[in-house]
């Protein structure tokens, strides 16, 4: 079986909800990192690109009808290059990379572009059609995040806890304190601030040209969700709106954000033929299901499964990128895997609590960050893992070349 490699990747800055990227359509946003990679590697024979695979969780607005294909065309890829959109909710971007890797390993492709995009700012309101004549009970949903058009049987059998409520469930089950969650959130902010100061995050980012009033254009180049100056006192003073006497706050949870990322995935032979450098081998990937009300613990079985497939242990990992949907679930995962709360190799440059969590993009961001960090610290293996709404987890192991 052939190996698949990450050759390079870029991402946009992550925008706040209603922030700098809210003026950019989702399909245009997805085109930005694709176009940047094409500009970086003008020698690429674009006709040899087998597919563009993007993750996107919403797909109810401008990201509808296969946003990967739309973004590929808008980026200037030939019409002969196909595109498909993956939806595994929060894990979509990482899953897209996995699909690309499997295509190469199976001999169904040699050169692919994979990543993800999400504009939560531009998520629309949706309304279902009437199911009977003269029906006047139309439901309207904000598609930014969470459940919509719920099947009554799903609600009866599994519940429909909101994402913050699932984090409260994990905290209650594993006795994770508010103080520990706020301390974790502060570390995320501090590590992100240091990575910004040291130019580490800038190495991943390509600018987005944002249209303004009267034809003006602004270049957006810096993640805008981090709060570098926040203190533990401020975090501990935030309200817990999701449950009475709860522990989950806006400060120890990830944000609602906008962004896009893309990576070049290739076989070794094709990479060398196209003037690319294989940087990181995609070793293995796994997914797993858990109880939906405890969705935040999904990375635990997914990680155990991918480690078993790779013949490795958690102690072999030099870098771990664990998506910080909530401090409660991130701490739950770390403790279940036998890792300390403040492990230096876990999210060394911060995570989603500080950077934000554009759902379809986040997994691709994790893979890009892990690949780059392996090379920075001369490590060998990295783990990327995420929880997923409705009770799933996804995990991928990378190896530095």
Feature names for model-found ranges:
Residues 1-71, 75, 166-178, 188, ...:
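Conserved active-site "lid/cap" helical segment
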Residues 111-169:
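Flexible glycine-/small-residue-enriched beta->alpha junction loops
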Residues 168, 204, 212, 283-354:
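Active-site pocket-lining segment
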Residues 86-118, 171-200, 262-269, 334-335, ...:
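Active-site-proximal alpha-helical scaffold in enzymes
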Residues 11-12, 23, 27-32, 43, ...:
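N-terminal extracellular/periplasmic Venus flytrap/periplasmic-binding protein-like
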